[in-house]
């Protein structure tokens, strides 16, 4: 097990074992960030769903009101006018068979992929590469669309995708430690609202059983999973 830094241990001690409201937890995660870098702030939720069942898969996307703090690298599978529109919207790489071949050889240096619908038959072959990395274009997240330019603009503007993993955990970022705490809280509130909206009707009991927020190199701050209404005015 890796040795923890003194800064990490100090942050862990400051957090203690308490269960915090989301607003308090996010503020504390930001304030106790042990790194001098502008770290990413990430939330982890444990959901009471069984992702092996098709009707309990939680997957979606949301545009964070204050963005993510990073410029996402976006690739687009498109041809003709749609390819030109994607380039004009700021896509980092646009292609068809050439892009598919490049990715099939292991290149995955991007954060999101968008596809024009008519190309999904070919893009689907990349499932073994893109699927495990949650990069496969999907209509449910708006990344399989004829309007590839809008998809690129949305992603560059702070749209994030999320998907529950096989252990029923769901991870998503809410910004950087350089953000004001209010902005981080409002980003979390937007994501939480969408995740709650997507609760499967077949999911019984408490939907969110565990919640934690942490910076890249910081300890997790436990949040009360029963608090589903978040108000930044509490800051």
Swiss-Prot record:
Molecular function as annotated in GO: rRNA binding; structural constituent of ribosome; tRNA binding
Naturally occurring in which organism (per UniProt): Micrococcus luteus (strain ATCC 4698 / DSM 20030 / JCM 1464 / CCM 169 / CCUG 5858 / IAM 1056 / NBRC 3333 / NCIMB 9278 / NCTC 2665 / VKM Ac-2230) (Micrococcus lysodeikticus)
GO cellular component: large ribosomal subunit
Family, as annotated: Belongs to the universal ribosomal protein uL1 family.
Alphabetic keyword roster: Repressor, Ribonucleoprotein, Ribosomal protein, RNA-binding, rRNA-binding, Translation regulation, tRNA-binding
Xref: NCBIfam families: rplA_bact
Function: Binds directly to 23S rRNA. The L1 stalk is quite mobile in the ribosome, and is involved in E site tRNA release.
GO terms of biological process kind: regulation of translation; translation
PROSITE patterns per UniProt: RIBOSOMAL_L1
Record Pfam families: Ribosomal_L1
Subunit structure: Part of the 50S ribosomal subunit.
PANTHER family, sorted: 54S RIBOSOMAL PROTEIN L1, MITOCHONDRIAL, LARGE RIBOSOMAL SUBUNIT PROTEIN UL1M
Protein name, entry field: Large ribosomal subunit protein uL1
């Amino acid at each position: 097990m890796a040795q923890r830094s003194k800064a990490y241990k100090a942050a862990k001690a400051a957090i203690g074992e308490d269960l915090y409201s989301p607003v308090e937890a996010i503020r504390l995660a930001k304030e106790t960030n042990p790194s001098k870098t502008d770290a990413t702030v990430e939330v982890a939720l444990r959901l009471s769903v069984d992702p092996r069942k098709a009707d309990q898969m939680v997957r979606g996307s949301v545009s964070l009101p204050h963005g993510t703090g990073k410029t996402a690298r976006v690739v687009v599978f498109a041809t003709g006018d749609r390819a030109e529109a994607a380039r004009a919207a700021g896509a980092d790489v646009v292609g068809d068979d050439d892009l598919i071949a490049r990715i099939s050889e292991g290149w995955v240096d991007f954060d999101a992929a968008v596809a024009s619908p008519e190309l999904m038959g070919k893009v689907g072959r990349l499932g073994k590469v893109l699927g495990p990395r949650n990069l496969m274009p999907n209509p449910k997240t708006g990344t399989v669309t004829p309007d590839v330019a809008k998809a690129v603009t949305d992603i560059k503007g702070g749209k994030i995708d999320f998907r529950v993993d096989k252990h029923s955990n769901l991870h998503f970022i809410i910004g950087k430690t350089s953000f004001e705490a209010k902005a981080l809280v409002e980003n979390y509130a937007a994501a939480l609202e969408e995740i709650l909206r997507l609760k499967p009707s077949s999911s019984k009991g408490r939907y969110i059983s565990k919640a934690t927020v942490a910076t890249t190199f910081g300890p997790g701050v436990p949040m009360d999973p029963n608090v589903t209404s978040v108000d930044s005015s509490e800051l």
